[in-house]
């Protein structure tokens, strides 16, 4: 069954605050094999002009995917998550994510398109400090396989 087009433009409430810790940044950097000292050493980060260690750019996926839960668990959308694959991910950083940041994320359904029997769900995650400072915009495309009517075009 196709996804509900009326969800385009729907904004979900902000996530609970997420405090970015130095150890989480180190763990993520290790997991993606990013050896830059700015992710591990506060002095190296300060020498590079940052107030504390900074996260690798893709660290934002932790916050964006956490926020996506509101969309994918919304039964009214009609999404069967067992048929979903991740199609695309882009980040626009307004500033680096830093240790000590307290961030929240608001997600918006930007688009739903039917292609070749699949629905393409585009979700935008706006990551900000709890004070409202923009930090990152993450845009994800999820492919819901076999949900659209065959032959539908958006």
Name these PLM-found stretches.
Residues 1-3, 88, 93-154:
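HotDog/MaoC-like acyl-thioester-processing domains
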Residues 1-88, 149-154:
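Hot-dog-fold acyl-thioester-processing enzymes
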């Amino acid at each position: 069954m196709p996804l509900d087009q009326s969800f385009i433009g729907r904004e979900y409430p902000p996530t609970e605050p997420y405090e970015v810790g130095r150890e989480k940044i180190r763990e993520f950097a290790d997991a993606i094999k990013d050896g830059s000292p700015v992710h591990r050493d506060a002095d190296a980060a300060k020498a590079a002009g940052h107030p504390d260690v900074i996260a690798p750019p893709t660290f934002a996926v932790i916050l964006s995917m956490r926020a996506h839960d509101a969309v994918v668990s919304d039964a009214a959308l009609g999404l069967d998550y067992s048929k979903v694959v991740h199609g695309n991910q882009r980040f626009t950083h307004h500033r680096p994510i830093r240790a000590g940041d307290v961030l929240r994320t608001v997600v918006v359904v930007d688009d739903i398109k039917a292609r070749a029997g699949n629905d393409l769900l585009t979700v935008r995650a706006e990551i900000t400090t709890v004070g409202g400072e923009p930090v990152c915009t993450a845009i994800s495309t999820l492919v819901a396989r076999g949900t659209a009517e065959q032959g539908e075009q958006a």
